[in-house]
């Protein structure tokens, strides 16, 4: 039975331009973030440089968005909204309280800095859709909320921590991959659903877990992102073995921007190497739970073309989890328990530093 009390869940994602007119704004927000674009420059110079880079990159990025067939924008906001709707239904089925689920983005619109998104507490809960902790995603989100409300939300009861190390997430992801290869997923629920399948037994192919890369300077600052990715992959691979999978398991990093050193090996390097050996290749987006430019265009088109060019025998893109029912129920369970048990600074533990207004700061 649902009571009159209404609780709000705010589903946070990185963001993406919904239309071509939002591309430069999205890029400006992205490169203005000190946890993403963290060059040792005075603030006014860093922001000026961020605006310059956004303006310069916008035309090139626009061509990539145009190629996806979503009106020149990214489907990420809409895909996140689908997850929000599914999660709202799941929460209201499980809870005696009424839940209203909103979508907010760290970059672009709807922007989580807007007034409609309230202070984190037990009645207003924030759930960032980042499986693994990184300074550039989770810590960035927490810093935005800290700037807005004057305190870090960790420990407030209104924040759901990253979930990529949870054994339940591993088993759900493994079953999702199994159901994809055995044609059990509803195709109409996934964008550009990959119709092609490897012309070999899926249990013997080479499975590449591709994560979004980050600059190595973040790792050197204490970001344990690579460790989290590796543990996520190990957990999923162990679960996949229960479905008979005994092929190759590989970790790589995609979406590098600029000349600085990033996490390696790159997915381009990994796929090139495997394809030259004549391998059957599948790519799973380990750090993404919503399909967008990096999964549909970069993995689905660019990496596929690279596989054929380098002599690979087959290539398949595995979709992101999206509204996979078990995943939505998993998130609902996380939301209902929130982070009331957290009694330490996860930012320092996972990202190398505490925020200024951390409630657990020594």
UniProtKB/Swiss-Prot annotation:
Q: Where in the cell is it found?
A: Cytoplasm
Q: Entry's PROSITE patterns?
A: FERROCHELATASE
A single GO CC term for this protein reads: cytoplasm
**Pathway membership, UniProt:** Porphyrin-containing compound metabolism; protoheme biosynthesis; protoheme from protoporphyrin-IX: step 1/1
Is Cell inner membrane found in the keyword set?
A: no
Q: Which InterPro entries match?
A: Ferrochelatase, Ferrochelatase_AS, Ferrochelatase_C, Ferrochelatase_N
Query: Which sites bind Fe cation?
Result: 212, 294
Its UniProt entry gives the catalysed reaction(s) as:
heme b + 2 H(+) = protoporphyrin IX + Fe(2+)
- Has the keyword Nucleus been applied to this entry? no
E.C. number(s) listed in UniProt? 4.98.1.1
GO biological process per UniProt? heme biosynthetic process
Keywords, ordered alphabetically: Cytoplasm, Heme biosynthesis, Iron, Lyase, Metal-binding, Porphyrin biosynthesis
Entries under Pfam families matching the protein: Ferrochelatase
Can you name one GO molecular function term for this protein?
A: ferrochelatase activity
Alphabetized HAMAP family for the sequence: Ferrochelatase
Function according to Swiss-Prot or TrEMBL: Catalyzes the ferrous insertion into protoporphyrin IX.
What does the similarity note say?
A: Belongs to the ferrochelatase family.
- Stated name of the protein: Ferrochelatase
Q: Which organism is it from?
A: Leptospira biflexa serovar Patoc (strain Patoc 1 / ATCC 23582 / Paris)
Give the source lineage, highest ranks first: Bacteria, Pseudomonadati, Spirochaetota, Spirochaetia, Leptospirales
């Amino acid at each position: 039975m649902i009571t009159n009390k209404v609780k709000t869940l705010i589903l946070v994602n990185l963001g993406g331009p919904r239309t071509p007119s939002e591309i430069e704004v999205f890029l400006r927000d992205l490169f203005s973030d000190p946890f993403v674009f963290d060059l040792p420059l005075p603030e006014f110079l860093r922001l000026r440089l961020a605006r310059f880079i956004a303006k310069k990159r916008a035309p090139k990025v626009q061509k990539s968005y145009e190629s996806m067939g979503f009106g020149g924008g990214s489907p990420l906001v809409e895909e996140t909204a689908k997850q929000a709707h599914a999660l709202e239904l799941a929460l209201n089925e499980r809870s005696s309280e009424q839940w209203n689920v909103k979508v907010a983005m760290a970059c672009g619109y709807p922007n989580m800095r807007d007034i409609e998104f309230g202070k984190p507490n037990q009645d207003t809960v924030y759930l960032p859709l980042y499986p693994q902790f990184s300074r550039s995603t989770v810590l960035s989100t927490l810093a935005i909320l800290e700037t807005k409300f004057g305190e870090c939300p960790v420990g407030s009861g209104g924040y759901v921590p990253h979930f990529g190390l949870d054994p339940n997430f591993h088993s759900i992801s493994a079953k999702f991959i199994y159901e994809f290869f055995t044609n059990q997923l509803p195709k109409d629920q996934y964008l550009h659903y990959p119709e092609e399948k490897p012309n070999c037994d899926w249990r013997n192919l080479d499975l590449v877990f591709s994560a979004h890369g980050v600059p190595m300077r973040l790792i050197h600052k204490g970001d344990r992102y690579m460790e989290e990715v590796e543990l996520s992959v190990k957990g999923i691979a162990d679960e996949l073995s229960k479905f008979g999978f005994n092929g190759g398991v590989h970790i790589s990093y995609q979406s590098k921007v600029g000349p600085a050193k990033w996490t390696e090996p790159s997915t381009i390097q990994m796929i090139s190497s495997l394809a030259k050996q004549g391998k059957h290749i599948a790519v799973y987006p380990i750090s993404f739970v919503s399909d967008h430019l990096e999964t549909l265009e970069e993995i689905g088109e660019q990496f596929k073309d690279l596989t054929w060019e380098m002599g690979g025998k087959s290539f398949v893109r595995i979709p992101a989890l999206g509204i996979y029912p078990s995943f939505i129920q998993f998130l609902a369970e996380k939301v209902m328990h929130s982070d009331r048990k957290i009694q330490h600074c996860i930012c320092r533990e996972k990202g190398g530093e505490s925020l200024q207004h951390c409630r657990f700061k020594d």
